[in-house]
From Swiss-Prot:
Entry GO MF terms: peptidyl-tRNA hydrolase activity; tRNA binding
Swiss-Prot/TrEMBL site (Discriminates between blocked and unblocked aminoacyl-tRNA) positions: 8
Record's keyword annotation contains RNA-binding: yes
Gene Ontology CC terms, in alphabetical order: cytoplasm
Organism: Thermotoga neapolitana (strain ATCC 49049 / DSM 4359 / NBRC 107923 / NS-E)
Protein's name according to its UniProt entry: Peptidyl-tRNA hydrolase
SUPFAM superfamilies: Peptidyl-tRNA hydrolase-like
Residue spans crossing the bilayer: none
Higher taxonomy: Bacteria, Thermotogati, Thermotogota, Thermotogae, Thermotogales
Amino acid sequence: MVVVGLGNPGPRYAFTRHNVGFLFLDYLKSKGWKSEKFFEWNKTELDGHEIVLVKPLTYMNLSGVAMPYIMRFFRVNVDDIIVVYDDVSLKLGKIRIRKKGSDGGHNGMKSIIQALGTQEIKRIRIGIGEKPEGMNLVDFVLGEFSEEEFKVLQKVFELSRNALVTILNEGIDKAMSVYNSLEVRV
């Protein structure tokens, strides 16, 4: 299984809402990342399953550019991939697991769907909350989490990790039925 977390490379974006995919992968494994031309990767073990963690380095809106390289490098097909990314239409504290679907207005996912030519891509969307009234969407997603929001996010990462374990052990349908209705709070 290859888990692709979406985000933007570089310290400027490290703790922004849009980098939830990268932050989740760092939660799973913080040290020992290796670099390739279009991505960084690492391996970790979840409940006895070895998984590969991948961060595309092409910036969010061009995430799809890295996908053919990732798939070739790890010798996987689209069925072996789960994409993890931020979602402004979900409350902070919620995740949504899907087997397939549209990009939902997310440019990183749009790029991946275009590059792979299919919407049948497994995904975990992590809620970052709706932008405040009157705030520009770009400013919101490129803004950093508050201290309180980051506490919630750590619990969301634990929930997302458990969802991944369920996907590995019992399948994505089971994970969807268990985790799509849950919400964490601090």
